[in-house]
Structure formats: C-alpha cells, structure tokens
From Swiss-Prot:
NCBIfam families: PRK07353.1 (NF005607). The lineage of its organism: Bacteria, Bacillati, Cyanobacteriota, Cyanophyceae, Synechococcales. Coiled coil: none annotated. GO terms for molecular function: proton-transporting ATP synthase activity, rotational mechanism; proton-transporting ATPase activity, rotational mechanism. The keyword Thylakoid applies. Its main location: membrane. This is ATP synthase subunit b'. It comes from Synechococcus sp. (strain CC9902).
C-alpha cells in the first residue's frame, strides 16, 4: 500500500492535457490499429464491395443486352407472324376461289345433266305419244272398218 501512496505522490497534478509517455503510446496504438483494420477488414470488405459492384454492373449490362435481344426477337416474330397471316389469308382466298370454281363447274354439269335428262324424257314422252297416236289411229281405223263392215252387213 505504501507503493501506491508513493506512486500517487510522485505524479504532479496536470492540466487539461498531460504530455507524458501515454500520448505517443496511444498514437502508436491508433496507427497500428488503423493499419491492422485496414489490412484485415477494410481492404477485404472493400474488395467484396467492388466485386459486388462489378457483378451488378455486368449483370445490368447483360440484362440490357438480353432485353435488346428479346425485343429484336419479338419484332422478328411479329414480322414472321404477320407474314404467316398474310400467307394463310392468301391460301384461304385461293382455296375459296378454287371451291367456287369447282362449285360452278359442278353446278354447270348438274344443270347440263338435268337438261339432257329432261330433253331425253321429253323425247321419250313425245315418242310414246306418237306411238300411242299411231296405235290409236290404227285401232280407230280397224274399229271404223269393223263398224262399217257390220253396218253394211246388217
């Protein structure tokens, strides 16, 4: 305990700042701590932050490129779709024209067949009528002759 009293008695009471050996020692400690923190913490963290910023910037650039590529592909696909629609429309128009032509041709053939059948039927009926007239005329002549013969014989 006497040592403590002696240690306290030998230290003069200072003012606001005491310029003794503790100040340079503290300055050396701060400088060493700064170098240590810089070497062990700030540089690795700074490198990680720089790497992350680089990754983000390359990711953004890649995203912009891919977006531009997607927009180009979308425009190309829109053009292809437009062309395909026009081609389909052309095929539909051609098919409709072909069907219309086939319909008209079939209709003309059916009308011609109907007219031919009608004409054949008319000729057949006319021939049968003439045949019936001839038979009737023959029978009328025969009956007339028979009636005249019976009237004269009676």
């Amino acid at each position: 305990m006497t040592w403590l009293l002696l240690a306290e008695a030998g230290v003069p009471e200072g003012g606001l700042f005491d310029l003794d050996a503790t100040l340079p020692l503290m300055a050396v400690q701060v400088v060493l701590l700064t170098f240590l923190l810089n070497a062990l913490f700030f540089r690795p963290v700074g490198k990680v932050v720089e790497d992350r910023e680089g990754f983000i910037s390359t990711s953004r650039a890649d995203a912009k490129q891919k977006l531009a590529q997607v927009e180009r592909l979308e425009a190309d696909l829109a053009e292809q779709l437009k062309g395909a629609r026009q081609a389909v429309q052309s095929v539909i128009v051609d098919a409709e024209q072909e069907v219309d032509g086939l319909y008209r041709e079939a209709l003309a053939q059916a009308e011609a067949e109907a007219n031919r059948t009608k004409e054949e039927s008319r000729r057949g009926i006319e021939a049968e009528r003439e045949s019936a007239r001839a038979q009737l005329k023959g029978k009328v002549d025969q009956l007339s002759t028979t009636i005249i013969d019976r009237l004269l014989a009676a």
